[in-house]
Amino acid sequence: ADGVVLGILLPSGCVDATRTRQLSELARPMSTTFHRAFDMSADLQNSLDDVSQAGADRLLTSGGEPDCLQGTDAIAKLVKSARGRIHIMAGGGINAGNVAQILQRTAVSEIHVGLATAVQSPMLVRNPRVSLGKAPGREYHRAQVLEESVRELKRAIAQPPANERGER
């Protein structure tokens, strides 16, 4: 493994900087990413400082919003505030339809995407009396990343978004 993802908040909504520092040090020489627990914190700017000072290499965030598109302004502020101390990675709701806009508005150099699609399991034998979770039937689906989804995302990243007049 090249890296570890972690994220610890105190009940107050502040970053648990002590434990984050301990875990970051234990993870070395691997890189550490503080995950989207950050988006649940009480104050994004203070939390950015805490995560950075605790030794994490990167911060995964949607800007404290349900997805990155809604959080572009906050993510852009975090990128400016980070001033190279820590990498800001945008993550949450990114897809081929919005990635170029998110990259342009935020100036992040790293993104996290979930391109998995639910596909039918090849399992031929099915037991309708047994469910392995609360939602029946999910055991007969699996998550799969389709090559075309990755190509589509790469094309969207390579092509700048159109401006208000439709010009690229």
Feature map (PLM): residue ranges:
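Active-site-adjacent beta->alpha loops and helix N-cap segments on the catalytic face
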Residues: 8-28, 41-47, 65-81, 97-101, ...
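Short, basic/glycine-rich phosphate-binding loops at helix/coil junctions
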Residues: 1-5, 55, 129-132
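Active-site pocket-lining/capping segments in soluble small-molecule metabolic enzymes
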Residues: 39, 89, 108-144, 149
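Catalytic cores of alpha/beta
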Residues: 42-54, 78-80, 88-90, 94-113
